[in-house]
Amino acid sequence: MIGAMAWILDLDGVVWRGDQPIAGSAEAIARLRASGEDVGFVTNFSYSPVETVEAKLAGFGIEARGAVSTSAQAAAGLLEPGERALLVAGPGVRQALEQRGVEVVADGDADAVVVGWHPEFTYDRMAAAMRAVGHGARLVATNDDATLPTPDGALPGGGAILASIERATGVTAVVAGKPYPPSVAALWARYGREGTMVGDRPDTDGRFAVALGYRWALVLSGVATSAEVDPPPDVVAPTLADLVAAYGP
């Protein structure tokens, strides 16, 4: 048994794959909660508003209101209320910024440029970001994931968009999502210093677990297909359901 005060779950590859739930995930989460464990969800996918993520989980029979943490929220936390942000990202980032009290602008001078994955990213948006950074705006990113997993294979992720802006501006962004310090601080504030991080991507979830000081539980239902990864996991299971059955309460 893993004696953890909190179980933090990545979503894609752990709870669902694309638009389909991974078998047994809802039941595993229900078992954890019935045993008094605190379950939270953390995702680097910044495009969708939190309510959309919560609704998707609810559609799979998983109650998640108030339990979802996104890289959009972490990025918004790097700005102060009243600041101006030039948005190069999706509606989830806009919502997080506006809830923070940040003014979102489409062009012109800004205190920060906030970059996240967006399927309609264009040269014009890159140029607007470049101009704003050239005029002194900070460069903030939700995440630097190079790829985005889809049922049809990997596609360019938010990190690919970010790389183009970093190259154009010569500025390295402050990255907010997993496994970087802003998300670490947010998770510590919410769940404390003891827990288990469950994920399928060693480069983000594994490194995040190490940064948090949490146990690193790797499931092989997503990106990783072997336990031979870096950082090495504390425990490995085929799915979340198998993990909870073997190591849970």
List PLM regions with ranges.
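Asp-based, Mg2+/Mn2+-dependent phosphohydrolase catalytic module
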Residues: 1-27, 31-37, 46-69, 73-249
